[in-house]
Every structure is written in structure tokens, then in C-alpha cells.
Amino acid sequence: GAFSSKPNTNPSPTIGKELVYEGYAEKGPSINIGGYPAGTKGARFSIYSMTDGKQYGRGTFYLSCLVNFSKLGANGMADFLGLSASYVGGSNRANIYVAREGSDRIRFGTSLLKVKAETTMAYDYDKTHLLVLKLDYANQKVSLFVDPELSAEEPAEASCIAEGDAENVLKHAIRALSFRNRSGFIGNVGNFRWCNSW
């Protein structure tokens, strides 16, 4: 950053190309994932505060976005988006993950605190995917839909579901969206939508 002896080792996110998914209404530029100088390791968080209140702490909420990855730098599931209970970030209640599947495919996953779930299907690199993350406070579930049918009705089955337990309870209100820019990754994320209905 600007106040380190090695400026720009973990750069701020930059504006990327517009992502398009047929039937999805949200438009505009994306955020570049990656862009670190060669040899740089680590990650940088950017926090996008939504509220300092508790209005997003009961009922059901949906975060949707478009993503397109051309390279993944980590082995295993790596988070890149999170919903935080803190106005300034941290304390994520739910995350969206991505992982390599062999040499030419990727998988996605989600979490409810420490409970994780992964998709059984694999998806293509260099293709724009629609992700819809559902937080269901009443039923203690976080669901991830990957490339769902865009209709008025929520699909009957999610791509993966993380269910709460005695130690992992969805109870704190969401106050911010957290983006984790990782070294070794190349891609884009954007076209966000936050709402209380499908």
C-alpha cells in the first residue's frame, strides 16, 4: 500500500471489463481479481459497507453476482467474497469459494461460519457464471446457486447448502460485503445485487 516500504505489493482492486449473463439485469464494470506484481503472495481485503444497523439480520437475503475466472492460484477452496457482520469487515457469516477441479475446470462452494459445502458439478474457466448466495436466518441455511434458471421462482434445489449447527448459528445482521483479492488469481467479479427476494 501507500504507507509501506514496498508500495503496491498488495494493490487495490481495479475496474475491469463488463460481465454479461443472458437474462441477468445488473450491468456495469466489474472488479479485476488478481493484478498483483509477479512473485507477490498474499491477499488484500476490500470492504463495502451496507449499513450499520440490524435490518439485514432476520428473514432471507440474496446476494447475486457475476464471476469469470481464467486462472486460480490456490489449491483447495479459496474464498473471494464474504458477508460480514461488521461494518468495517471481518466476522464473515457466509463466504463464496472457488477451487480448481483438475486442470481445466473449477468448482464453487459456500459456508455458514465454519460449516462448508461444495458443488458437486464442475464449471468452465473463461466463462461468465451467475452466483446467487442465499442466507436463510429462519432455517439456518446458506445456499449457493450456480448458473440458475432465471425465472420468477427460486429453483427447488441449490448447487450446495451449508447448514448451521449448535456451534455455527446464523444470528448476527449483515453489515458489509467483503472482497478478497488474491495473488495468483486472474478473473473478474461484479454486477452485484442484494435483495430479500428471488
PLM segments and residue spans:
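Short beta-strand segments enriched in hydrophobic/aromatic residues
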Residues: V67-F69, R100, L135-Y137, P148, ...
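Surface-exposed loop/edge segments in extracytoplasmic proteins
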Residues: G90-A94, K114-T119, L150-C160
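Secretory/extracellular carbohydrate-interaction modules
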Residues: Y24-R105
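Predominantly extracellular/luminal cell-surface or secreted proteins
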Residues: Y62-S64, S84-S86, S143-E149, C195-S197
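Flexible glycan-contacting loops in extracellular carbohydrate-active proteins
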Residues: P155-R193
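Short tryptophan-centered beta-strand motifs in secreted/extracellular beta-sheet-rich domains
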Residues: L63-C65, D126-L135, V142-L144
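Short, aromatic/His-centered strand-loop micro-motif at the edge of beta-sheets
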Residues: R107-L130
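Extracellular glycan-recognition surfaces and repeat-rich motifs
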Residues: G1-N32
